Amino acid sequence: MLILSRKTNQKILIGDDIEITIIDIRGDQVKIGVDAPPSVKVFREEIYQEIQNENRAALVRDTELNLPELHIKKK
């Protein structure tokens, strides 16, 4: 893990198209801004974990469905 020290308004660049800016530092909280292309998904860790848990739960629900056999009518 790379560990960096930054001050307010300083930036960290990731690759060619992701920019992290330190917006504010107050006590033990750091406010950051993330500038990334729309194709890059950016989540807080707790939100990402919630999404993963919901996806797993949906997968289990979908596999438990007992759908009747579907018949396709031929024209």
Curated annotation (Swiss-Prot):
Name a Pfam family for this protein.
Answer: CsrA
One CC-aspect GO term: cytosol
- Classify the main location: cytoplasm
Task: Keywords in alphabetical order, please.
Answer: Bacterial flagellum biogenesis, Cytoplasm, Repressor, RNA-binding, Translation regulation
Q: Where in the cell is it found?
A: Cytoplasm
Oxidoreductase as a keyword of this entry, yes or no, is no
The record ties this protein, via PANTHER family, to:
CARBON STORAGE REGULATOR (PTHR34984:SF1)
Tell me the function of this protein: A translational regulator that binds mRNA to regulate translation initiation and/or mRNA stability. Usually binds in the 5'-UTR at or near the Shine-Dalgarno sequence preventing ribosome-binding, thus repressing translation. Its main target seems to be the major flagellin gene, while its function is anatagonized by FliW.
Protein name from the UniProt record: Translational regulator CsrA
Species name for this entry? Treponema denticola (strain ATCC 35405 / DSM 14222 / CIP 103919 / JCM 8153 / KCTC 15104)
GN (gene name)? csrA
